[in-house]
């Protein structure tokens, strides 16, 4: 039955170029040269989290004032950093190496209001994935899931967690981790992200493109080439369509796609626009260029 669903989904043609989001202009902002990459955009669109080109450290950049605040120097902190739904807490990683030169990853939470910092996952070689839903962090380590509250009064909810293990898409639900991989285990997966309402997951299949399906693996929808996909809302995804020569990216656009197969380029050909970060509550999307430039696009549904 699953194979039939996959075949049917792959046969659905993309609806083509159509307006997915209304665009209201694009603004270039000046960020510190040492942290030119946007790691995350606050939900309310008031600040960016910036990191170095190799994802070391995190800096909070206030968009209104242009002021910066160093949050951490931790190696790897900018890779996969997560913001809580209220924008007051972050979860970031810290890479370290043992005596055998093997990498271990720890997770820390930081309250951006009071500065309180806490290690929520000790250094491990088996960290498979983590996510933030509301004010809780879900951590999958060695196929076991733990939920950490990031704020007092948090009511913990066990939503599905997705991670990549040996190029396969894994799901952890009810304390059990299993292979999910809706398009088959002969494929390689990357970039999974749960939808805001926790009913769908977007992911990318290497060499094929991005897909969305329900968290039970049904209703697979192809989205085309949309790399590093992020949910803008429960029915819209933003990502990048980049082109390279094997060494360098020479073209890239920020794309918006919906679950009906409509797609729209949000950036001009003159920019190499990469790795979008949406702030849906503020109707904004940020992105970076390989040259260290940062832009913010104003959008609306």
Residue ranges and their predicted role:
Residues 1-20:
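Bacterial Sec-dependent N-terminal signal peptides
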Residues 19-301:
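Sequence signature of WD/YWTD-type beta-propeller architectures
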């Amino acid at each position: 039955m699953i194979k039939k669903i996959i075949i049917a989904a792959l046969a659905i043609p993309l609806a083509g170029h159509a307006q997915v989001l209304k665009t209201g202009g694009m603004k270039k902002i000046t960020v510190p040269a040492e942290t030119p990459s946007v790691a995350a955009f606050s939900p309310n669109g008031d600040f960016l989290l910036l990191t170095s080109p190799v994802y070391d450290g995190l800096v909070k950049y206030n968009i209104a004032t242009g002021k910066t605040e160093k949050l951490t120097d931790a190696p790897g902190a900018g890779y996969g950093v997560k913001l809580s739904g209220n924008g007051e807490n972050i979860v970031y990683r810290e890479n370290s190496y043992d005596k055998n030169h093997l990498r271990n990853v720890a997770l820390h939470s930081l309250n951006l209001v009071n500065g309180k910092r806490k290690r929520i996952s000790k250094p491990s070689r088996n960290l498979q994935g983590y996510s933030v839903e509301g004010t809780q962090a879900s951590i999958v380590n060695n196929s076991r899931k733990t939920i950490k509250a990031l704020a007092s009064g948090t009511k913990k909810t066990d939503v599905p967690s997705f991670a990549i293990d040996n190029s396969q898409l894994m799901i952890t639900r009810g304390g059990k981790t299993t292979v999910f991989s809706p398009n088959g285990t002969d494929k390689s997966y990357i970039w999974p992200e749960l939808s805001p309402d926790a009913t769908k997951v977007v992911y990318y299949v290497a060499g094929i493109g991005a897909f969305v399906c329900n968290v039970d693996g049904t209703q697979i929808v192809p989205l085309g080439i949309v790399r590093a996909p992020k949910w803008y809302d429960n029915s819209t995804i933003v990502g990048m369509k980049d082109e390279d020569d094997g060494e360098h990216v020479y073209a890239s656009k920020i794309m918006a796609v919906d679950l009906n197969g409509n797609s729209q380029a949000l950036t001009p050909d003159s920019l190499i626009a990469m790795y979008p970060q949406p702030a849906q509550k503020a109707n904004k999307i940020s992105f970076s260029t390989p040259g260290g430039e940062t832009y913010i696009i104003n959008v609306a549904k």
